[in-house]
């Protein structure tokens, strides 16, 4: 086993609305501080002049553009937020196939971190470097029935070989997410409200647990890797390695768009551990 801070990693995220651009920049600053040797790939959009939704992608070799294979227009409704979160599955499949080889010559290792996430120290997740692994915080509150336990996709690590079990899940997740971009909002079986990308991924990994070539599923501690702050005071949760500043509280519902959230960047940054 090795800690992830001792392994090559491609860390990625995107911001698909101008309101998220500064969030993405702030998140990446914390990654550079705590994991200066990781490869970083980011996207910002929408970019004008393309038929389908398009992001400008910043790679180590320069900039390029990636366009979704389906079209949608932001219309100011709640569905905007859900369409954008469904882009995550497609984005991760793009990263896996085009860029993940940067992480390791024979093993892809890609980590997603939401733009509103902030690292507070070096991540200490332990991985078997040659295993097929999906690692993420899970919501497993004792008061929640086991069938409703689910992935929290603000931070996800995918590790595996080309053509392996993890790649198979990524392909299906991307296809499901792309399909749901064009569907009306559907209820989630795990949380109140419509389902999003993490619901689709949870269903896939749960169905694959019985497969003979299944991957290892690491359920990381929710409070440590998905530290949700106090919404009233803005105080971060003690003992976290990732603070998640939950921009959905401002961006999901149209009536919340003018909400004074999250706190200013300088108020969110913590001393290095």
For each feature predicted by the language model, list its residue ranges:
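N-terminal anchoring/stem segment of glycosyltransferases
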Residues: 1-83, 97, 101-106, 160-164, ...
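A structural signal for well-ordered alpha-helical segments within the folded catalytic domains
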Residues: 25, 86-90, 195-203
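A residue-level signal for conserved active-site and pocket-lining positions in enzyme catalytic cores
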Residues: 31, 92, 116, 156, ...
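Short, hydrophobic beta-strand segments that form beta-sheet elements in well-ordered domains
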Residues: 36-45, 109-116, 134-135, 243
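Short, polar loop motifs at secondary-structure junctions
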Residues: 41-49, 60, 117-124, 140, ...
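Short loop/helix-cap segments at secondary-structure boundaries that form the rim of catalytic
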Residues: 47-54, 123-129, 236
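GT-A fold catalytic core of metal-dependent nucleotide-sugar glycosyltransferases
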Residues: 84-151, 155-163
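Catalytic core and acceptor-binding pocket of nucleotide-sugar-dependent glycosyltransferases
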Residues: 161-273
């Amino acid at each position: 086993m090795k800690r992830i801070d001792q392994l090559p990693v491609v860390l990625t995220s995107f911001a698909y609305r101008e309101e998220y651009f500064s969030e993405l920049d702030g998140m990446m600053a914390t990654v550079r501080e705590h994991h200066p040797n990781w490869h970083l790939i980011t996207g910002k959009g929408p970019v004008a002049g393309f038929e389908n939704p398009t992001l400008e992608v910043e790679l180590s070799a320069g900039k390029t553009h990636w366009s979704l294979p389906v079209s949608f227009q932001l219309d100011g409704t709640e569905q905007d937020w859900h369409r954008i979160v469904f882009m995550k599955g497609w984005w991760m499949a793009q990263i896996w196939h085009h860029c993940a080889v940067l992480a390791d010559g024979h093993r892809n290792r890609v980590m997603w971190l939401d733009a509103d996430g902030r690292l507070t120290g070096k991540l200490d997740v332990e991985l078997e470097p040659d295993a097929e692994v999906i690692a993420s915080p899970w919501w497993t509150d004792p008061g929640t029935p086991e069938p409703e336990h689910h992935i929290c996709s603000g931070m996800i690590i995918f590790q595996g070989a080309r053509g392996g079990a993890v790649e198979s899940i990524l392909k299906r997740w991307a296809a499901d997410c792309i399909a749901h971009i064009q569907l009306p909002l559907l209820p989630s079986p795990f949380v109140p409200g419509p389902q999003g990308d993490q619901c689709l991924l949870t269903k896939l990994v749960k169905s694959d647990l019985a497969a003979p070539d299944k991957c290892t599923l690491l359920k990381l501690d929710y409070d440590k890797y998905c530290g949700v702050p106090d919404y009233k005071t803005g105080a971060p949760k003690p003992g976290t390695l990732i603070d998640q500043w939950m921009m959905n509280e401002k961006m999901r519902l149209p009536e919340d768009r003018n909400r004074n959230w999250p706190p200013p960047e300088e108020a969110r940054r913590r001393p290095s551990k």
